[in-house]
């Protein structure tokens, strides 16, 4: 079966979303599909690509920036020429008359269309973002029901059975275990504990709760050191806010920012750290149930972690600590106590999700429901 994985942006090596998409594509191929990837390549010029082939050259400058958002005839032509029967679209909150025309034409070609909404609901995420981002949401809200009317199924990581009157396929975020290195070093934590937060930093990650907790912890002049390592870029306003908290809390010696890391550099940080920090403020965007990528990466790496949402894949695991879904500072003493109570080694932690949460397992659920396609 010929399939197209369609995204409306490009790839970045350090970006967790890029890694996820590549893992999903790999999984679809492992399930037996002939998959091509449609994406944007942006350097000096703007190109729409199918794998390594340019299907549209938008040039450069302001007109190129406009064309890449409104011109999709090259995609329609490709799907028709190659007789693509299954299209998997990663939603980018970009419903508008042009993307509506795209999915309408794809449906006219008798394609089965599946739309992944990475986070749902997402409207309240925008309340923390600058005005330019809010304009994206307003346009999306105006057109999204018309957009999804041409979609057969919506893939969601929530428990919703329908979204905007379209039936859903409920899956978990998965892991490509071959690409995630298991932690091999058990650090000496008798005198210090290293925490790790990996994210494209937004308010709902709630790392400020750790920072405020550290500020309170160090007011007591403890002998035991706790250091927080933050990996990833983020919304500038949020990062600036974190840096103010660090300065005001006098904890600059105990918090380290690294920016985006991938490959061996990221592996090195995981070896150095002992516990993962998941999302601690999903309540800010009105989300309770979610199955985040980061929780799964922490488990695949083999480290215990904390979070505050409801994640059904981990709720009863002995290596996770649930925090309250509020804005209170994280109690660092309790965090240390929890870490010392975990008895599982990295391999044992990883083994708890090894079969269920592979991307091949999750994407096979999508194919079987969307295409009524029995995999061997």
Tell me the role of every PLM-derived stretch.
Residues 15, 94, 205, 264-269, ...:
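Nucleotide-sugar-dependent
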Residues 76-98, 111-114:
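Short N-terminal targeting/anchoring amphipathic segment
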Residues 187-214, 229:
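Conserved donor-binding/catalytic core segment of Leloir-type glycosyltransferases
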Residues 232, 240-268:
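Nucleotide-activated donor-binding/catalytic signature segment of Leloir-type glycosyltransferases, i.e.
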Residues 326-330, 334-375:
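A charged, aromatic-enriched C-terminal amphipathic alpha-helix characteristic of glycosyltransferases
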